[in-house]
């Protein structure tokens, strides 16, 4: 019989006594006992955020010193490894010269070298993005002692392949955190 007051019973102040059943209890009057200034409220909010009462804001650039939990986020991709030359830069706008530059390694449509391609035909017939370098060219190949254990597949936007290839790093452990 809630709400019934028995003789000799003092009224219960709900601001002082709160049970676990009153999680959603809101007091009738705001700031019954103390008034908090906006500066103090901002300071309290910062303290609560530091103590993880709020949802923690993840660092978009995790470091190895942060430990393994920093790398457990599901949206981590191979771009987080920071391999230049394989993935298009987000802030780069393609110009007309970049679109006409020969950059594919597909042997079904084009020769392997840019110079070979210019010697064989019209350089304006191939319209591709310059974000994926041609790894068949010797100037893009790593040194002989560095090229062991790698299988590097650049992106090939030609009609024969129909898929975008990414570098396969077969030396550095499981691919699961980076290729989901």
Swiss-Prot record:
Any keyword Signal? no
Where mainly found? nucleus
Quote the tissue specificity entry.
Answer: Testis-specific. Detected in the germ cell lineage at all stages.
The record's Gene Ontology cellular component field reads: axonemal A tubule inner sheath; cytoplasm; nucleus; sperm flagellum
InterPro entries cross-referenced by the UniProt entry = SPMIP9
Provide the coiled-coil residue spans.
Answer: none
Q: Which domain of life is it from?
A: Eukaryota
| UniProt keyword list | Cell projection, Cilium, Cytoplasm, Cytoskeleton, Flagellum, Nucleus
Is the NADP keyword given for this protein? no
The protein's location, in the record's own words, is:
Nucleus; Cytoplasm; Cytoplasm, Cytoskeleton, Flagellum axoneme
- GO process annotations (BP): flagellated sperm motility
Pfam family example for this protein? Answer: TSC21
User: Function, please?
Assistant: Microtubule inner protein (MIP) part of the dynein-decorated doublet microtubules (DMTs) in flagella axoneme.
**What assembly does the database describe for this protein?**
Microtubule inner protein component of sperm flagellar doublet microtubules.
By what name is this protein known? Protein SPMIP9
Give the source species. Answer: Homo sapiens
The gene from which this protein is expressed is SPMIP9
